[in-house]
Amino acid sequence: MAALLHTLWIILAQPQFSFPSNPIATEQIMLRWLHFIFGIIWIGLLYFFNLVGFPTMKQLDAAVRGKLYPVMMSRAMNWFRWSALVTVLVGLRYYWMILAADAQNSGNPSLVFRWFGYWLLVWLVAYALIYPFQFPGKGLLDNGWVRAIAIAIIVIAAAWVVLILNAGPQVSNGHLSISIGGGIGFLMLLNTWGVVWRVQKRLIQWTRQSVEQGTPMPPEAERLARWGFIASRVGFWLSFPMLFFMGAAEHYPFLSSIAA
């Protein structure tokens, strides 16, 4: 019996835990963990809106849709916009740590400010160029393919400019991949707060008033709904390259050669 208990103890004691003593490693794993959690909430809701929510709403009777929409979208938008903000803020801190490590390895720690400044400027300009392409238009201006091609060109150009500006012999694949993936995520955050939330806030209010007080929907409601749908669909498609580059940061070092 004693031998059996001893053997069992040896088996149970096999796992060995050794937590890193480096506080930077602990901070990074906590940042990545939070980034994953809130990113899943954000992108999960984005996919729900585009793959399930919007198509289902179109098939519902007006009376049912009017009662369901304010209740569902109020809760969904709270989670959607705040999880987006937390995801990006946590991601920016992690990105800054990657930049700082590369700058330290290059022998010029001040490079972190230049790299981050370039990154922020390029993606802000990219969003300013993308923004008008999301407005509902007429004819060719409201063609999905035209809109998709224009936005794709802007995003690709922005990504290439960031790679050129941030390239260097000590620049890591994680630095370059997150510069692109995080940049696209930043565009999505600006759309979440700058378009989708602004539109949905008004549509929720108008729909609730229409159901509870019989107030007719304003004439601009249809245009705003279309604008919000386009912005949400743009975020949906941007999420695919965003997720690829974020995953490639740690698991697919194909951008390191650009910095060589």
Regions found by a protein language model. Give the residues of each.
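Polytopic transmembrane helical bundles with strong interfacial aromatic enrichment
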Residues: A2-A260
